C-alpha cells in the first residue's frame, strides 16, 4: 500500500471537529514501550507498542504509523483500556487518533488494500465492539463508521434471531470481502448460551461507513453436528 509520508492527515476531536495533525505538538517516542503517551488513564501501563512502516515503493521501510495499547483507570469509568495511534508527518510523530472507551485494545492490522483495523472490545459479558477502522484515501486516514450497520442488520437475520454481543471482524483480506462473524441468540436464550446458529455478515465501505451486503446464515444443527455423525 502506498502512503505518502508528507501527506496532510487529520485528527478527530470532540464534537466531530477536525484539525491538521501538523498543528499538534510533536511527540517523542523514545519511551514508547514503557511510558503511556497522551493518555487520560491513571496508573497507566503500556500493554503493547510498535511501528508500522511503509511497505511499498521507494519509501519502503520509512516510518509511517506507531501505536500503544494501554491499561489503567479513570475515577468516572473505573478500569479501562486505551489506545494511541500516531502518524509520522514531516519528520515528526503526531497523534492520529486515541480512544479510552474499551476494556482492551489490540495492535492495529494494516491490509494491502489500505485498511487499518485496530481491534477492541468493552468490558462486561457483552464484550461489545470498540474497534476502530480507517481507510487510506491517498491523502489521509479516514475514520470509518463501524457502528451504524449493527442497528439495521436485524432486518436481514432470520426471524427470532438476534445479535446480543460483539462480533468478530475479519478485515485482513478485503479483496475477498470484509466480514463480521457472530453467534445468534433466540429470545428465550440465556446470555451465555446462544442457540440460534451463526451468521457470516459480508460488508463493504460506502460513504465512510460499513454497510451490509449479504448475511449468510448457518443453522445451529449444521454448526453443532460433529464430523463423525455426517452421513457417509
PLM features: residue spans?
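Positively charged n-region of N-terminal signal peptides that target proteins for export
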Residues: 1-4
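Bacterial N-terminal signal peptides
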Residues: 7-17
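Terminal domain-start segments
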Residues: 21-103, 225-231
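Surface-exposed loop/turn elements that mediate protein-protein interactions on large endomembrane-trafficking
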Residues: 82-98, 133-148, 205, 209
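Short aromatic loop motif centered on NTY/YTY
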Residues: 101-136, 140-201, 218-229
